[in-house]
Swiss-Prot record:
Natural source organism: Heliobacterium modesticaldum (strain ATCC 51547 / Ice1)
Family membership: Belongs to the class-I aminoacyl-tRNA synthetase family.
Keywords in alphabetical order: Aminoacyl-tRNA synthetase, ATP-binding, Cytoplasm, Ligase, Nucleotide-binding, Protein biosynthesis
GO biological process, one term: arginyl-tRNA aminoacylation
Lineage per the UniProt record: Bacteria, Bacillati, Bacillota, Clostridia, Eubacteriales
Keyword Hydrolase: no
PROSITE patterns with a match to the protein in the record: AA_TRNA_LIGASE_I (PS00178)
Protein name as annotated: Arginine--tRNA ligase
Chief localisation class: cytoplasm
Length: 563
């Protein structure tokens, strides 16, 4: 149950009732009450919730916002749940609640257990999250790694929030890059077999391609040497793509990312999907021919220039395939499509939304998360290249260096739109300075407390014992109340992080919860001689374990019981 949302609804109803009462009494002159926000103030002294409704309606009421706020506050029925309601600043209304609303949270967490934090906000709506979609011509780099952590955590959040989620990897296995890949493979293949051939100028210079061709020769010898060049390239690409994709899949699984669908760009060409998309665009009036090429009328939809879809040589552009791919996504019946792209694709977002509109779908159902760059630091200096390979640092190397959990946490710690400075030394440090260590240590400490309690013969109150009258009101220390409040926040936090596509909120929540638990443990002795207080605190400790575990699992991290 989302206790925070329930309280929001209760406060909202009280505000609406107060406004309607003031309007009926001719104290204020306002029309229909618009939707208004109820937020949690940053400063505790500003109460538990705050609203700006008076500021929203002041102009219509022809009153100063503070004056309108005071009219509202005067008519709010405080009942036995509202401790205080005050006007603050330019016209905010701050609400402070009695602690009683928090206590039902504790047994609810026990009852829900692994499902605590889940909600039905998504109502089963179908969502596709496409992320990473790295070129299968090389290894996964830091941008891919950040996208993997963000995308997978977002997918987990959406599932928790009640959406039907599909994770998809788009395989870029067609177009110019594959032609260059084929030429590169052929050159390395021939060179390894003793032929003196030049390497293509725009080829892929990675050592991994040499290793791929060396592996092929070890398995199959020079059987492709006698083939005509185009056929040889086709066979080499087929072998290399299979190997590269297997390697990418293994690396991502090692990183905790498992996809539901791997979608091939080449399949769009082979199935006629691109041609069908062009026909749809033509029927909708968004295609014209110029100098032998087919163009998309992007300017008719507000873009600065039109885009080529089919070159004069008859070969479709990448954009044509991308439009066909997005049409395919919506053809499959998704209610919401989310792409995670690198920030260098920012110019492509509006083009793609307009293309979605041009093929007959609602562009508002497509969201694109743009992800900023990652910089690795070691010893206070930027790490640009791998010492082992002389190339960019790969995700495999990062996992070896800092571990999956630290890598995933660090990548999700900042919003996608923020540049990320990844400190390798910090990620390995076993101290409170390292955020992932700090959070996981909190979970391990909780497990240690529960083991100690069990060894002393004390059990966490369960089911009937709680329902039969465990007095939770003894939990009245500020550190206890702050911890319970944070626990109560989780379902609301998950729902917001999912619907607003902000997986970094989970990292922040985990850190806040860990800090509040450490504070509680410092100020409140758990295994006290007072049975009633001890039982209540053991329940709070176990709830903290459940919540921290659920958040760590949502982020794709382990919840260690010992450290």
């Amino acid at each position: 149950m989302n206790f925070v949302e329930a309280i929001r609804r209760r406060i909202s109803a009280a505000v609406v009732q107060a406004l309607e009462g003031a309007r009926n009494a001719k104290e204020v002159n306002v029309g229909p009450i618009p939707p208004f926000a109820l937020e949690v103030p940053r400063e505790k002294q500003h109460g538990d919730f705050a609203t700006n409704v008076a500021m929203l309606m002041a102009r219509e009421a022809r009153m100063n916002p503070r004056q309108l706020a005071e009219k509202i506050v005067a008519r709010i029925d405080r009942g036995d749940w509202l401790k205080d309601v005050q006007v603050a600043g330019p016209g905010f209304i701050n609400f402070t609640l009695h602690h009683a609303w928090l206590y039902p949270v504790l047994p609810a967490v026990q009852q829900a257990d692994e499902a605590y934090g889940a909600s039905k906000v998504g109502a089963g709506r179908r969502v596709q999250v496409e992320f990473v979609s790295a070129n299968p011509t090389g290894l996964l780099h830091m941008g891919n790694a950040r996208g993997a952590a963000l995308g997978d955590t977002l997918a987990n959040l959406l599932r928790l929030a009640g959406f039907d989620v599909q994770k998809e990897f788009y395989i870029n296995d067609a177009g110019n890059q594959i032609e260059n890949f084929a030429k590169s493979l052929e050159a390395r293949y021939l060179q390894l077999l003793g032929r003196d051939v030049p390497f293509p100028e725009e080829g892929y210079h990675g050592e991994d391609i040499v290793e791929t061709m060396r592996g092929l020769i070890a398995k199959e010898g020079d059987k492709y040497l006698a083939l005509e060049s185009s056929l040889r390239r086709e066979m080499l690409v087929k072998y290399a793509l299979r190997e590269k994709l297997d390697a990418i899949r293994r690396t991502l699984e090692r990183f905790g990312v498992v996809y539901d669908v791997w979608f091939s760009e080449q399949s769009l060409h082979d199935s006629g999907a691109i041609q069908q998309t062009l026909e749809r665009l033509r029927a909708n009036g968004y295609i014209y021919e110029n100098e032998g090429a087919l163009w998309f009328k992007a300017t008719a939809l507000g873009e600065e220039k039109d885009e080529v879809l089919v070159r004069s040589n008859g070969i479709p552009t990448y954009f044509a395939a991308d439009i066909a791919y997005h049409k395919n996504k919506f053809d499959r019946g998704f209610d919401w499509v989310i792409n995670i792209w690198g920030a260098d694709h920012h110019g492509h977002v509006s083009r793609m939304k307009n293309a979605v509109k041009a093929v007959g779908y609602d562009p508002k159902k497509l969201d694109v998360i743009l992800m900023q760059l990652v910089r690795l630091y070691k010893g206070g200096e930027i790490v640009r290249m791998s010492k082992r390979t002389g190339q960019y640092i790969t995700l495999d190397e990062l996992i070896e260096e800092v571990g999956k959990d630290a890598a995933r946490f660090f990548f999700v710690m900042r919003g996608a739109d923020a540049h990320l400075d990844f400190d390798l030394d910090l990620a390995k440090r076993q101290s409170s300075e390292n955020p992932v260590f700090y959070v996981q240590y909190a979970h391990a400490r909780i497990c240690s407390i529960l083991r100690t309690a069990q060894e002393a013969g004390y059990a966490v109150p369960q089911g009937q014992q709680v329902e039969a009258g465990l007095d939770l009101t003894v939990l009245d220390h500020p550190a206890e109340l702050a911890l319970i409040r944070k626990i109560a926040d989780l379902p609301d936090e998950v729902a917001r992080a999912a619907t607003q596509m902000e997986p970094h909120r989970m990292a922040r929540y985990a850190q806040d919860l860990a800090a509040l638990f450490h504070s509680f443990y410092t100020h409140c002795r758990v295994l006290t001689d007072e049975k009633e207080l001890r039982d209540a605190r053991l329940l709070l400790v176990d709830d903290s374990r459940i919540v921290l575990r659920n958040v760590l699992h949502c982020m794709g991290l382990t919840a260690p019981e010992r450290m």
